[in-house]
Amino acid sequence: GPLMARVRSVARAETDAPIVHAMYDLIFGKGVDPAVDGARTTTGSPGDWWTTHALSPAVLEHSVQGFVLYRDPNRAIDPELRELAQARVGWSSGSTFVYSQHVQSMRGMGMDPRKIADLTAWHTSDAYTTIERAVMAYADAIALDGGRVSDELFTVLKDHLTDEAILELTY
C-alpha cells in the first residue's frame, strides 16, 4: 500500500516546528489538526501527505520550497506544460494523490477543461498542441520507461523549449 497509510501522522500538539503549524493552517485552516480531526485538503484529498511529512520538519520544508520554486514566475517552463507533465506522471504511476492535486492546479489556472479531461488518453485526443503532446510523451518516458527518451521526442522538445525549460520540466 501507499507509504502515507503505513507511517504515523503527526498531530499538531506533538510538534513545535513552525513549518508544520504554518502548513497545517494554510492547507486545512487555522488551528485545524488534520492528524486528529481527519481533515481533508481544500481539494478533497486526505491530509496524510502533510501529516506524515511532518515527521521530519526539514523534509516538509524542503517539499514546500519545491512548491515555491514551481510557482516562481521566473521559471523557464510554461506552468501549464509543467502541470500537464506532473498530472500525467501521477496518472501513469498510479498516484491518485499526485494526479488529483495537479488536476486541481490545472483547473485553478483556468486550463481548457477538455485538456484536463483528455489527459488520461492524450494519445487519442486532438485537444493538445505539438509541444503539449511531446511533454506528455516525455512524462510517460520518465514515469514508465525508466527515463529513456527517444531522440525523436527529444528533438521535438528542443524545437519548442530551451535547455533550461527542459531541465525544469525534468526536475
Predicted regions and their residues:
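Secretory/endomembrane lumenal or extracellular ectodomains immediately following the signal peptide
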Residues: L3-L81, R107
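Short acidic alpha-helix initiation/capping motifs at coil-to-helix transition points
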Residues: R40-T41, A58-V64, G94-Y99, A143-D151
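Alpha-helical scaffold segments that form or flank carboxylate-/histidine-based iron centers
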Residues: G44-T52, D78-S92, T124, A165-Y171
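Conserved alpha-helical segments that form or flank metal/cofactor-binding pockets of metalloenzymes
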Residues: E61, E83-I116
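Short amphipathic alpha-helical segments and their helix-coil junctions
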Residues: E61-R75, D118-A121, D151-D159
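Helix N-cap / loop-to-helix initiation motif
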Residues: I77-D78, G110-R114, T162-D163
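Acidic/His metal-coordination segments adjacent to aromatic residues that form catalytic metal sites
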Residues: T120-T129
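Acidic/histidine-rich alpha-helical segments that form the ligand environment
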Residues: I131-Y171
